[in-house]
A protein has these predicted regions:
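Exposed beta-strand-loop-beta-strand "reactive/processing" segments of non-cytosolic proteins
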Residues: 45-73
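A short, surface-exposed beta-strand/turn
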Residues: 67-92
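Sec-dependent N-terminal signal peptides of Gram-positive bacterial secreted proteins and lipoproteins
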Residues: 3-25
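Short secondary-structure junctions
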Residues: 44-51, 111-117
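Generic "edge-of-domain/loop-turn" microfeature
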Residues: 64-66, 76-78, 149-151, 182
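Short, non-transmembrane alpha-helical segments in secretory-pathway proteins
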Residues: 23-48, 96-106, 157-158
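Extracytoplasmic electrostatic interaction patches
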Residues: 90-227
């Protein structure tokens, strides 16, 4: 009886090992296919890949490890057919996105700092997709910081919404008015520090979908000084 139990446990262990190995190879194969798709589409190499979701892989651009791209095998046409998609196209247009954003922001603020983050939302757009089509998807978030006084903040917001809407840039803008000393220290790596510790005079989120929207302002409590 004891030997029989030992054999059963051994068989179970072998089965578990086999299943784990099979899953590992399935995952590796999926990642390999995702990297191959990106190589063929963009003629660029990607690596440091890992599973982000069941049907999605996160990977970085080999020549710029700071850029992480999401690649997904999904039903983009809602017809039951799956194909590869990604969000790297937005990174290729980053300079243009920044330029168009700055054109709007500069009409409102004398001093500003702008940081653009591409959201983890994929598409199957071809390489020659017009920038306006990318804008209409709205799958990016723009962080805007200024040291301007908050007295005209509501009018400032109206101008930003109008300017972005005119460019069909249907995105999310996280706008913050900072103290002059904090504005000087502000950098992209301090975004979470500012928002998490209330290091702002006033802050709001703008969702560029229409010209009319109410701004809900938050006022900072300055739990700490910006380092």
């Amino acid at each position: 009886m004891k030997k029989k139990r030992t054999y059963i446990l051994l068989i179970v262990a072998l089965l578990i090992s086999f299943i784990c190995t099979a899953c590992m190879w399935t995952e590796e194969g999926f990642i390999e296919e995702a990297e191959k798709y990106m190589k063929n589409k963009y003629n660029d190499s990607f690596g440091s890949s890992f599973m982000y979701d069941r049907d999605a892989v996160m990977m970085s651009l080999n020549k710029n490890q700071k850029i992480y791209v999401l690649v997904e095998y999904g039903d983009f046409k809602d017809n039951g057919t799956k194909e590869w998609g990604d969000n790297y196209l937005y990174y290729l247009h980053m300079d243009e996105i920044y330029k168009d954003t700055k054109e709007v922001i500069d009409t409102v603020y004398e001093n500003s700092k702008i940081y653009i983050h591409i959201n983890n939302i994929t598409n199957n757009f071809p390489l020659d997709t017009d920038i306006v089509e990318l804008y209409k998807r709205g799958t990016f978030t723009i962080y805007v910081y200024t040291d301007k006084d908050i007295v005209d903040k509501d009018n400032d917001v109206l101008k930003i919404i109008q300017g972005m809407y005119d460019k069909s840039m249907y995105c999310t803008i996280r706008l913050s008015y900072l103290r002059e000393s904090d504005f000087t220290k502000m950098s992209e790596d301090k975004i979470n520090e500012v928002s998490g510790n209330g290091i702002y005079n006033a802050s709001t989120n703008l969702y560029i979908r229409s010209r009319e929207q109410d701004s809900k302002w938050r006022y900072g409590d300055f739990k700490k000084d910006l380092e």
